[in-house]
């Protein structure tokens, strides 16, 4: 009986030590399936709602990471900081790139369905430039840093300073991305008002 309990505790501890669990795939699969269903329905209202929801989630998380988490992280002890980063890895490695990609995809389809996905509109050009900057930041800096953190955490003796440095870079980058997303929100507001040429 005690052996079974001990084995169960061992398994539980091993599960807890895992950085990425099988359930982590759900934060990629579920949003992706939902967006595919929304695109298949071709309902502009539902697609608009989905785009706003995804974009708002992306902006909110980036803002929280950049303004709050980065400041809290500096005041943490090294051990607490590394454990906190380890817990965040699944979200930062899988959820954030997924939400960002789906928000952009939903936005492109929405603009196409509304007949405004054209380079003759300044709002589309500006939105495209900002999205390009966000994509470059996300997939050329943010994601590679998260992968470095993940592989460093898997080592028998992780480099705490390296992990903290990379995590802080990403948290601060999240704040920068939030600023670009505010610009996107301004553009979206103009599109909603029919001001496609940004006339004031």
Residue spans for each PLM region:
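Polytopic transmembrane helical bundles with strong interfacial aromatic enrichment
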Residues: 2-200
């Amino acid at each position: 009986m005690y052996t079974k309990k001990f084995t169960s505790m061992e398994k539980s501890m091993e599960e807890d030590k895992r950085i990425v669990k099988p359930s982590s795939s759900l934060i990629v699969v579920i949003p992706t399936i939902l967006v595919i269903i929304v695109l298949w329905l071709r309902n502009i209202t539902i697609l608009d709602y989905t785009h706003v929801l995804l974009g708002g989630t992306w902006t909110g998380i980036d803002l929280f990471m950049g303004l709050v988490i980065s400041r809290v992280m500096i005041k943490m002890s090294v051990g607490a900081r590394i454990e906190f980063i380890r817990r965040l890895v699944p979200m930062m490695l899988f959820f954030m790139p997924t939400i960002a990609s789906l928000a952009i995809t939903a936005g492109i389809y929405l603009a196409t369905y509304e007949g405004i996905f054209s380079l003759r509109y300044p709002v589309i050009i500006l939105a495209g430039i900002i999205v390009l900057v966000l994509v470059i930041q996300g997939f050329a800096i943010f994601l590679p840093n998260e992968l470095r953190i993940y592989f460093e955490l898997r080592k028998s003796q992780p480099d705490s300073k390296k992990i903290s440095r990379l995590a802080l870079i990403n948290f601060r980058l999240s704040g920068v991305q939030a600023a670009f997303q505010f610009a996107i929100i301004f553009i979206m507001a103009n599109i909603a008002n029919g001001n496609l040429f940004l006339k004031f």
